[in-house]
């Protein structure tokens, strides 16, 4: 296999050579490696340096970069698995070159996770993680991390695929990135609570072409019930920007108070908070001591997530301004005015124009229009 040496964080490793002239170079190598996911891996290394689980499974390792970095930079016991024999050979080569004591296994991830337990289980497949979440929920002791790159089904752009994979009806709204993250979270929670286990989000975010969950698992039916209580729906008006939130297994019919249209249920999805502030604060404190090529971006993301409201949807500031036919001013000014009126308001990490508030839509529109 033709390989090249790459560095991420403090780890040097070999990856399969790719054709840079193709539209998607990672798919051209004999073993998959996507350099665009470096931020995802940097964040994982940072979080694990705070959590320090007793063992860690990189269930779909490919070249092994995620597991290699965890073993080398965090120093915890790591197992790297892949079904591709060439990937396993490359991962073993990387383990040996780094002088690591790490286990590399060859086989189906579901079979491995069905037979063994790990303190932290990490799912980072190509595409949807849906076929692996059930076995991961049984294998993970305290932590479950999940990446999804099938953003179109999760966000409602490919509706039928989203319904098949996640048993949810996402909707392609102006807050579609948050719909995708919460749809993924809702699916994972429903898979976990079957086993009388609860879920607590630690650090969950959407970025470019992926959604990422870092979750703490709790034991007991009471913990499962607490998680179940946060499954629900965003009820979206098809005619205007009004939306409301409902919790429960089935949505109740609801009418838009602004235009009388029947609200459309989006979900089921997770309606609760998506981050734990103490965890984010610990990550911020640890960031200077971690070598991360995307450290500046992670720092900005953590800062935004810490002040982001826990409402289940956000508004796109520019969409509101366009509907009102006004020129959008500074988003910070809108937030300041909402807070001055007694409402909560913040930016959201999903985009530069994402705004969260508990103010009624007419109040928000009045503030945006300068009234």
UniProtKB/Swiss-Prot annotation:
Record EC number: 2.1.1.216
InterPro entries assigned to the protein according to its UniProt record, in alphabetical order: SAM-dependent_MTases_sf (IPR029063), Trm1 (IPR002905), TRM1_arc_bac (IPR022923), tRNA_met_Trm1_C (IPR042296)
A Gene Ontology BP annotation from the UniProt entry: tRNA N2-guanine methylation
Pfam assignment, any one: TRM
Residues at which S-adenosyl-L-methionine binds: 41, 66, 82, 108-109
UniProt GO MF annotations: tRNA (guanine(26)-N2)-dimethyltransferase activity; tRNA binding
Residues that hold Zn(2+) according to the record: 237, 240, 256, 259
Family matches, as Gene3D superfamilies: N2,N2-dimethylguanosine tRNA methyltransferase, C-terminal domain, Vaccinia Virus protein VP39
Protein origin, superkingdom: Archaea
Catalysed reactions listed for this entry: guanosine(26) in tRNA + 2 S-adenosyl-L-methionine = N(2)-dimethylguanosine(26) in tRNA + 2 S-adenosyl-L-homocysteine + 2 H(+)
Entry keywords, A to Z: Metal-binding, Methyltransferase, RNA-binding, S-adenosyl-L-methionine, Transferase, tRNA processing, tRNA-binding, Zinc
Coiled coil start-end: none
Residue ranges of domain Trm1 methyltransferase in the record: 4-368
Enzyme class: transferase
Similarity-based family: Belongs to the class I-like SAM-binding methyltransferase superfamily. Trm1 family.
Function: Dimethylates a single guanine residue at position 26 of a number of tRNAs using S-adenosyl-L-methionine as donor of the methyl groups.
Protein name: tRNA (guanine(26)-N(2))-dimethyltransferase
Organism: Methanoculleus marisnigri (strain ATCC 35101 / DSM 1498 / JR1)
